[in-house]
Amino acid sequence: MHDPFYDIFPRPPEPVWRTGEMALITIDMQYMDAHPDGWMGRAAGAVGKRDVLTQRYEAIARALPRIRQLQDAFRAHGEQVLHARIAFRTDDGREAGRAFMPSPHEQSIARDERDDEILSEVAPVGDELVFSKTSSSVFSTTDIERVLWNLGVRHLVFTGLVTDGCVELSARDAADRGFRVTLVEDATCSSTPEAHEDAIARMTDGGFIVAKSTEETLELLESMSRALTPAGVGDAA
């Protein structure tokens, strides 16, 4: 739903893509919540509700090759490829915030060491940075902001899951901290199409976060490489 407040002012220009300032970040594409055999799937199975995650896993399957394509392209262009995951330091997750603290029922679902692992299709290569979080936003419980500034990153391109949860909160936090933010809408996913589409609409309503398809993102990356900045595009930051 559109907020008419944004009609008062001109829409912000889309961000410039500059070499050396880009980072692709993939949120929570790990066994715990992105694989049917992960902790979330096991928890659903324990109460006979595996079917509620069917659309989620179908969306993940569609997004994975797109994320990999984007990762390979960013690597080829010498831009940063980053990863964020949920990873507790304790068996029961007691160090997490209340929103992430497992309920008594969830605590009974045994955790597997694979749950922390990022899916092999989009796994880190070499010494790519992995940020382990115990919160929805990667900015809340990691040092990612300091690292991004140290790396010279000013523009974050988001992929991963879920669009209406950890992706949205991380993207909004990034925008609040002065980073340019692009969301790859067909390389992010939610448990339902409706939740995904609603989150995209909310995030992009004011123009401070821009949504692009995988194809459009790859074209912008190529354009940046050829011309350093894409022709005819304004700068939002």
Can you annotate each of these PLM segments?
Residues 83-87, 91:
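Catalytic-core segment of enzymes that process non-peptidic bonds
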Residues 59-61, 71, 75, 81:
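Domain-level signal for Mg2+-assisted phosphodiester chemistry and nucleotide/NA-binding surfaces
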Residues 48-65, 104-113:
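A short acidic, glycine-rich active-site loop
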Residues 1-23, 36-44, 69-77, 88-89, ...:
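Active-site-adjacent betaalpha module
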Residues 25-27:
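Short hydrophobic beta-strand that contains or immediately precedes a catalytic carboxylate
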